[in-house]
Amino acid sequence: MVMKGGKYDRLSDLNCFWAANDPKKPDNLFARSEWRNGVFKNYNTLDLFYVGYGGNDNSTTRFRRYNGKYDGGADDKVKPLLREYTDTPHLLVPNQWYQISIRVQKGVTTYSVNGEELFRYSITGSEGDGHFGLRLLQNHVLFTDFKVRIF
């Protein structure tokens, strides 16, 4: 997170999702993109894993499992919180590079930062298959050496 006094230099929300699918359009995640239109609650209709690293103005780092069954109900039913950190070592630091690794392999998905595994979740079948995406909110982020590898 770049913090040098720029317009979007805001220390918050290095968020990503993976294994994303739309249960209503299982063959095309993008079919309802216009309807979702960046509205956060409309993403509750997707099936995915989500990490909000340094979310809520850099006060939380959370791991959620969106189940794609949004019916207007409570968030904890649609996207249950699997784990949360609120301690300083698991929040964003200004102008620091991060090595983030997300794995979906051998019945498990993991999310690690700088070699520390923060989140682990057991999966079955094709549960880890799907799309990857970044969700950044009014911040300034630089990426280098971005890779997607299939094992």
Model segments located where?
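Extracellular glycan-recognition regions
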Residues: M1-F151
